From Swiss-Prot:
Forms part of the ribosomal stalk, playing a central role in the interaction of the ribosome with GTP-bound translation factors. Keywords: Ribonucleoprotein, Ribosomal protein, RNA-binding, rRNA-binding. It holds the Pfam family RL10P_insert. Belongs to the universal ribosomal protein uL10 family. The lineage of its organism: Archaea, Methanobacteriati, Methanobacteriota, Thermococci, Thermococcales. CDD domains: Ribosomal_P0_L10e. GO terms for cellular component: cytosolic large ribosomal subunit. Part of the 50S ribosomal subunit. Forms part of the ribosomal stalk which helps the ribosome interact with GTP-bound translation factors. Forms a heptameric L10(L12)2(L12)2(L12)2 complex, where L10 forms an elongated spine to which the L12 dimers bind in a sequential fashion. One of its GO terms (biological process) is cytoplasmic translation. One of its GO terms (molecular function) is structural constituent of ribosome. This is Large ribosomal subunit protein uL10.
C-alpha cells in the first residue's frame, strides 16, 4: 500500500472542514491567473468568501468525504466539475451573487497567441497612435479597414476581428497589442457552485438582471389586473377593486335614472343634454325663452372654445398616457409586497 504524505491528509481534512462549514461551495479555475491579480481577488473576497487553492485530487477527495459525512450525495457531483487549476471558494453568498462578483472583478488583459477570447473583439473606428509601417499591410490583409491619414494609421469603421470563443492568432495578437486593445480577462472563472443539493453552472448563473426585473414587473401587472378584474381583494388591489365597483354601480344607477346624492348631478345633466338635443331640432316658435337661453348658451360655449380635432386627439392621448403612467406607478409600487 502506497504511503500517503501527512500534509496531504491534513489538507484533505482542512478542505473537508471548510466544505462542511459553508452553505455554498464553488469551484473556480485559478490557472493562468498571475499572483498579483489573485492577491487582489483574495482581498476583495475577504469577509465574503474563503478562497482555498489546492491540488485537484485533494479537492476531489475532500468533496467526496464531506458529501459522505453530511449525507448529501448531490454534493459529490460537484467533483465532476474539477478542471484546470481548481480551487475551492466557500461562502454564505448565494451562487448568483457570487458569480456576479467574480465576473465584475475580472480585469482586461493583453492578447496572447492561442488564447480564446471571452467575447467579441472590435477594433473601433477612428485615429490611432500608430505610425505608418508594415502593420498597416497586415491589418488590410485581415480585412481591417486601415489607412494612413495625417501621418497616422486610422481605422475607417468599427471592425469585429474575433467572435466570442475564437482563438487569437500570433498575427492578430501583434496587431491588438500595438493598438492597445486588451481582449482577454484575468480573474477567477467559476466552474460550478453547490447550494441546497443543487449544482449551478455558469450558463445558469449568467442571468440578465434587467430582463428578469422586467419579467417580474410584467408578471406583477398581470396578477394585479387579474385580482382587480376577478374582484379578488388583496392589500395591493383592494382600493382599485372598490373604485371599480363604485364606478360600475354609479353607471348602472345613472343609466337606470336612480337618484342618489352621488348620481343626481349626472342624471340631471344627461336629461338636460337629451332635452337640448331635441329642442335644437324644433321650430323656434315652439320654444320658450328659457329653452332659447339654454340653446344660445350652449352655442356660445361651442364657439368660444374651438379646438381642432387633431389637437383634441393629441390631448386625449396625452391624458390617457398620463393616467396609464399613474396607474402603472401605483400598481408597481406594491411589487415587492405582492411577491413576498
Amino acid at each position: 500500500m502506497a504511503h500517503v504524505a501527512e500534509w496531504k491528509k491534513k489538507e484533505v481534512e482542512e478542505l473537508t472542514k471548510i466544505i462542511k462549514s459553508h452553505p455554498v461551495i464553488a469551484l473556480v479555475d485559478v490557472a493562468g491567473v498571475p499572483a498579483y491579480p489573485l492577491s487582489k481577488m483574495r482581498d476583495k473576497l475577504r469577509g465574503k468568501a474563503l478562497l482555498r487553492v489546492s491540488r485537484n485530487t485533494l479537492i476531489e477527495l475532500a468533496i467526496k468525504r464531506a458529501a459522505q459525512e453530511l449525507n448529501k450525495p448531490d454534493l459529490e457531483k460537484l467533483a465532476d466539475y474539477i478542471e484546470g487549476g481548481a480551487a475551492i471558494l466557500a461562502t454564505e453568498m448565494n451562487p448568483f451573487k457570487l458569480y456576479k462578483l467574480l465576473e465584475e472583478s475580472k480585469t482586461p488583459a493583453p492578447a496572447k497567441p492561442g488564447a480564446v477570447v471571452p467575447k467579441d473583439v472590435v477594433i473601433p473606428a477612428g485615429p490611432t497612435s500608430l505610425a505608418p509601417g508594415p502593420l498597416v499591410g497586415e491589418m488590410q490583409a485581415l480585412g481591417i479597414p486601415a489607412r494612413i491619414e495625417k501621418g497616422k494609421v486610422t481605422i475607417q469603421k468599427d471592425y469585429t476581428v474575433l467572435k466570442a470563443g475564437e482563438v487569437i492568432t500570433e498575427q492578430l495578437a501583434r496587431i491588438l497589442n500595438a493598438l492597445g486593445i486588451e481582449p482577454l480577462e484575468v480573474g477567477l472563472n467559476l466552474l460550478a457552485a453547490y447550494e441546497d443539493d443543487i449544482i449551478y453552472t455558469p450558463d445558469v448563473l449568467a442571468i440578465d438582471e434587467q430582463e428578469y426585473i422586467n419579467m417580474l414587473q410584467q408578471a406583477y401587472m398581470h396578477a394585479f389586473n387579474l385580482s382587480v378584474n376577478t374582484a379578488y381583494p388583496t392589500k395591493q388591489t383592494i382600493e382599485a377593486i372598490i373604485q371599480k365597483a363604485y364606478l360600475g354601480a354609479k353607471n348602472v344607477a345613472v343609466e337606470a335614472g336612480y337618484i342618489t346624492p352621488e348620481t343626481v348631478e349626472d342624471i340631471l345633466g344627461r336629461a338636460i343634454r337629451a332635452f337640448l338635443l331635441i329642442a335644437q331640432n324644433l321650430p323656434e316658435e315652439l320654444l320658450d325663452e328659457k329653452t332659447k337661453e339654454l340653446l344660445n348658451a350652449q352655442a356660445q360655449v361651442a364657439v368660444a372654445a374651438p379646438q381642432p380635432a387633431e389637437e383634441k386627439v393629441e390631448e386625449a392621448e396625452e391624458e390617457e398616457e398620463e393616467e396609464e403612467e399613474a396607474s402603472e406607478e401605483e400598481a408597481l409600487a406594491g411589487l415587492g409586497a405582492l411577491f413576498g
